[in-house]
Structure formats: C-alpha cells, structure tokens
C-alpha cells in the first residue's frame, strides 16, 4: 500500500547533539497519509552503544535517558546501527516510494544530520525536502497569538513522533485554515 502522498516521520534519540562525536541510541518511525492520519508505526529500536560512548553523554542526556530507561535498553540491546537502519528502511519501503516523501518531525534537521552520517540509506530514501513542525511553532510565536501546543516531552522516540503529528494538526487548524 505504497503511496507518494504518505509522509515519513522519524525521531532519533542520541547521546548528544554533535554529529561528529555522538551516536544514535534510538530510532522510531511512523507513516501518515497527507491528512496526518497514522497508517503504521514501527516499534522503537534501542541501538546498542558501548559503555565508552554512553560515558561521553552530557548531563542532560544522562539524566533524561536514565529516567526514560533508554540508557539501560541501549546497554541491553543486541541491535547495531546498521541493523536498525535496515529494519526502519524495510518498514518505510512498504508505504512510501523512493524519494517521494519529505522527512517529517520536530527540529528534523538535527535528526537528518545523524541519519546522513550513520544511516545514509534512510537519508537517501527520503526526499531532500523536510517538513519541520518547529517552523509552524515559531511562526505562531512571531505572528500568531503565541498559544502553543502543549507537549509532554517524554523524549521517547515514538511518543515524540506522535506528539509532532498532533502538534502539526494543531497548527494546521490554528494557522493555516486549510
């Protein structure tokens, strides 16, 4: 049930924001139709990283990933970055033709940088365009009434994608009148 109108939503959790020194610890993906109805969800994948990689996390990552249980899931995982990339790519291919969907999410440019470096096959499969929900959030702050979508910010990849989709629906109704 591939469709060029379907959208690819991805969220990553990482050991930090520096693409040159940090690694991906979790990936999740959701496919929606163009009206933002969820078609399918890929289970989030914790990606194994050795202790020396985890030891280099900043304070925010240590606190957050410990509280969510991600750090332990990463330590216990048997899944490599390459295996996680392959699983997510197989999921995406079921629903979206090659280079037909923009990569969607919040501050998605940051995720895209990590995909380009560590999961280049996913990066290449997505269209070069990106649908960044953060743009609408900022436009609402600058030109709207300032009332923004309230997020739970669980920093769990699948939860974050679901929130991004809900946030885009919120801003679509509020700002776009379409």
UniProtKB/Swiss-Prot annotation:
- GO cellular component term of the entry, any: cytoplasm
Q: What is its EC number?
A: 3.1.15.-
EC class = hydrolase
The record, for Pfam families, names: RNase_T (PF00929)
Q: Which domain of life is it from?
A: Bacteria
Where in or outside the cell it occurs: the entry states: Cytoplasm
**Per UniProt, what is one GO molecular function of this protein?**
3'-5'-RNA exonuclease activity
Exonuclease domain: which residues?
Answer: 7-168
Q: Where is the active site?
A: 128
Supply the alphabetized keyword list: Cytoplasm, Exonuclease, Hydrolase, Nuclease
Role summary? 3'-to-5' exoribonuclease specific for small oligoribonucleotides.
Q: Which HAMAP family match?
A: Oligoribonuclease
PANTHER family per the UniProt record, alphabetical:
OLIGORIBONUCLEASE, MITOCHONDRIAL (PTHR11046:SF0)
- What this protein is called in its record is Oligoribonuclease
